[in-house]
């Protein structure tokens, strides 16, 4: 049995705490809202973020980060991208031993264009960080909380750390694979939120299955183009953290990004949507970062570019769709073939 600290008491952090508790680990959750923490610790539920799920009574929750981190064997970072640096700065002052950091958020920092593993490496010094491990894949917290079969991938430059995390989480309901391609896993997980926003828009506009199928397929091509240019393995995007995560996020009402896009497609303004949802929609921030990365790496990402114009420049959603359909004709597979050929050289 290991002591595992989960930083973050949202839906995903809570669901993963449940998996770890099912595996008989000593799970300590940290959050900053006393009312929510009391709900988890005393009533064994998280009605705000994971309703209708009974949490194991063994899960402990606290607002005292020092208490949560004391003697821990691993730290699960389960806070939104925009809060990661602040939380890590606090944790860094309290960590007394070298432990692996497992991040489960999906995004890109807009100001620096860094992946989350790079942010952790900046904020936590080597003497306190055994390794950085990414956990990603098609995994709605709502279904994990109900113990429905779920499969994810863990990735790290340190294979032993990846296998350690694999063993922490693996059980009959939660299958875990390893993949050494950290860049590909992170980019796939982050950018699928952009395509999910766009998929929600097409559904909100009532365009039907044809449009969404094309959007998902061409969206995957965009993700793979940028991810490979940044150093990822193109095969990763055909796996759980690529096409797998893309499918689940673009087609499910559980997806915050899909729901956000759906409301945009129905005519709501972005500010109205975010206020109405009352939850973090990572795809909005990620769109800004991915748009900038596409310019930096000189990669064609027409869906991302169109969504950027909708979110941040006020372009109408139906005009954005029209501009995508009116693009200059091109070959479907040429760039993907070149991508694989370059990988094998």
Swiss-Prot record:
Chief location: cytoplasm
Family from the record: Belongs to the NAD-dependent glycerol-3-phosphate dehydrogenase family.
**EC annotation from Swiss-Prot or TrEMBL:** 1.1.1.94
User: Which positions bind NADPH?
Assistant: 11-12, 32-33, 106, 141, 256, 280, 282
InterPro entries the UniProt entry points to: 6-PGluconate_DH-like_C_sf, 6PGD_dom2, G3P_DH_NAD-dep, G3P_DH_NAD-dep_C, G3P_DH_NAD-dep_N, NAD(P)-bd_dom_sf
**Pathway stated in the Swiss-Prot or TrEMBL entry:** Membrane lipid metabolism; glycerophospholipid metabolism
- The annotated active site, in chain numbering, is 192
Its annotated function is as follows: Catalyzes the reduction of the glycolytic intermediate dihydroxyacetone phosphate (DHAP) to sn-glycerol 3-phosphate (G3P), the key precursor for phospholipid synthesis.
EC main class here is oxidoreductase
User: What are the annotated GO cellular component locations?
Assistant: cytosol
Q: At which positions is sn-glycerol 3-phosphate bound? A: 106, 137, 139, 192, 245, 255-257
GO biological processes: carbohydrate metabolic process; glycerol-3-phosphate biosynthetic process; glycerol-3-phosphate catabolic process; glycerophospholipid metabolic process; phospholipid biosynthetic process
Which PROSITE patterns is this protein grouped with?
NAD_G3PDH
Its localization reads: Cytoplasm
Q: What is catalyzed by this enzyme?
A: sn-glycerol 3-phosphate + NAD(+) = dihydroxyacetone phosphate + NADH + H(+); sn-glycerol 3-phosphate + NADP(+) = dihydroxyacetone phosphate + NADPH + H(+)
Name of the protein in its database record: Glycerol-3-phosphate dehydrogenase [NAD(P)+]
Q: Has the keyword ATP-binding been applied to this entry?
A: no
GO molecular function annotations of the record? glycerol-3-phosphate dehydrogenase [NAD(P)+] activity; NAD binding
